[in-house]
Amino acid sequence: MIYGVGTDIIQIDRVRGVMERTRGRFVEKILGPREMKIYLARKARSEKRGLAFLCTRFAAKEAFSKAIGLGMRWPMTWRAMELLNQPSGEPAPHCTGELAEWVRERGLTVRVSVSDEHEYAVAFAIAERGGQLAAPQSEPASN
C-alpha cells in the first residue's frame, strides 16, 4: 500500500555555488559517512562527477523526506538517511538512529530513483507500508 511519494529536482550550478561559498563544508552537512567515501572517490576522478553525486544525494534526501511525510524535520536529518547502491547498482536508502526506528515502527519500505544530466539532478521516492526491501550491503558498491 502506498504511504507517500516525493520528488525533488535541483540545479547543479546552484549547489556548485553553495560549495564555493562554504568552501566545501556543505558536503559535510549533507552526506553520511559511507556516502562521503563514495563522493571523495568520485571527486578524485572527476570534479564534475563528484558534484553530480552530491546533487543526486541531496535530491534523494529531499524526495525521501517528502515520501515519508516528514519533510526535513526530526527525526529526518540530512545524514540520518544515506542512499547507497546495491551490488546490482540499484540505489537503496539506509536509515540510521531515530529515523531508522521511526521508519521501522511504521512498517515502511522506501524506494528511491535518482538521475542527473548536465544542469539538473532529480530524485523520486515512493514509500510503501509493508513489504520487504533488502538492506544495502555494509560496504556499498563504489560505482
From Swiss-Prot:
GO BP annotations, alphabetical order: fatty acid biosynthetic process
Main location per the UniProt record: cytoplasm
Record InterPro entries: 4-PPantetheinyl_Trfase_dom, 4-PPantetheinyl_Trfase_dom_sf, ACPS, Ppantetheine-prot_Trfase_dom
Catalytic activity as recorded in UniProt: apo-[ACP] + CoA = holo-[ACP] + adenosine 3',5'-bisphosphate + H(+)
Keywords: Cytoplasm, Fatty acid biosynthesis, Fatty acid metabolism, Lipid biosynthesis, Lipid metabolism, Magnesium, Metal-binding, Transferase
Enzyme Commission number: 2.7.8.7
Molecular-function GO term, any one: holo-[acyl-carrier-protein] synthase activity
Function: Transfers the 4'-phosphopantetheine moiety from coenzyme A to a Ser of acyl-carrier-protein.
S-S bridge residues: none
Record protein name field: Holo-[acyl-carrier-protein] synthase
This protein's record includes keyword Transferase: yes
Family to which this protein belongs: Belongs to the P-Pant transferase superfamily. AcpS family.
Subcellular localization: Cytoplasm
Annotated Pfam families: ACPS
Cofactor(s) annotated in UniProt: Mg(2+)
Entry binding sites for Mg(2+): D8, E62
